[in-house]
Amino acid sequence: MALQRATHPYSAEVLMELGIVGLGRMGANMARRLMRDGHEIVAYDVNPEAVSQLAGEGAGGASSLEEMASKLSAPRSVWIMVPAGEITEQTVDAVAAVLEPGDAIVDGGNSYYRDDIRRAAKVGEQGIDYVDCGTSGGVFGLERGYCLMIGGPDRAVERLDPIFASLAPGVDAAERTPGRDGDPSPSENGYLHCGPNGAGHFVKMVHNGIEYGIMAAYAEGMNILKNANVGKVKREADAETAPLDHPEYYQYDLDLPEVAEVWRRGSVVGSWLLDLTAAAMQESPDLAEFTGRVSDSGEGRWTAIAAIDEGVPTPVLTTALHERFYSRGLGDFGDKVLSAMRKQFGGHDEKAS
């Protein structure tokens, strides 16, 4: 395949070749978005069916990393989209083994930025450039585009600019900030070269930490609204239960799907996360199919660690992370200790739930 190569940054019109390793929901949709813009994709996945499906849509399929590399013209670029951790570690090593000096690897998953620094040094010994790219957009990215936070050497990032430009949402995804005139910058188009290796995933890490806090705020607010009718329930006052002094203040049976809808329009708390909350509540107002067990994928923990290392207070983000731990029953034994202490010092028996 002989395609025009990028000779300058910030051009969305230059077509490129790109190998993509990992064809899950995000990897496959990113390939589709790039193909829509005319880029040529060579796809590989450990699942041959995923490769066949994308090949049927116009991608070049590969049954091995060696075949993928052979179908790409030098200098090659390979985008890895696999789960963070050991799988990424193994995949980076395997991809580097089939590349040559001057080629580039992009890790578009949610890797720890410290791992990026180490991996960049390792593959750099082979003359291979390493780019870390924090990717936000999820399953909606095919149509909406992906917000890209990029770290790595200038030469590699500039060469990959047409890929980033095609994946990003574009300037029309949001109103331009007052005072920004002239041609839109890459950041206004939805992608940013944040700095050297690790910077992209560092920014994405904090992005996800903020996401935890925003989600927790919506959840807590909705819980207050859900219980605004507590005054209708008789609460016995005894030594073990604080009385509700004014039950008349809590007589509201609020329609939470409707509250979410009204907040979406003109409210200062409007956001895409609120849009998704409204959609979930429209489908199931009581969310009965959910247990409330909330996972954390690592970025919230890494954000808290960075805040501690920097000496920066982050009570909201850290509490939101701890609430996720609590949702998984990890606070249950601590609660038993509290109950046991009350029994010891005051003879307080537990009340039935």
Predicted regions and their residues:
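Helical "substrate-binding/catalytic lid" subdomain
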Residues: G145, M149, R159, V171-L317, ...
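Hydrophobic beta-strand scaffold residues
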Residues: I41, G61, D129-Y130, T314
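Short, well-ordered coil/turn residues at beta-beta hairpins
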Residues: M81-V82, G108, S166
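Beta-loop-alpha module in the N-terminal Rossmann-like domain of NAD(P)-dependent dehydrogenases
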Residues: E66, V78-A94, Y112-D115
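Phosphate/pyrophosphate-binding betaalpha-module
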Residues: R155-P169
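NAD(P)+-binding Rossmann beta1-loop-alpha1 motif at the extreme N-terminus of oxidoreductases
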Residues: L3, H8-S77, G102, V139-L142, ...
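Rossmann-fold NAD(P)-binding glycine/threonine-rich loop
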Residues: P101-A104, G108-V157
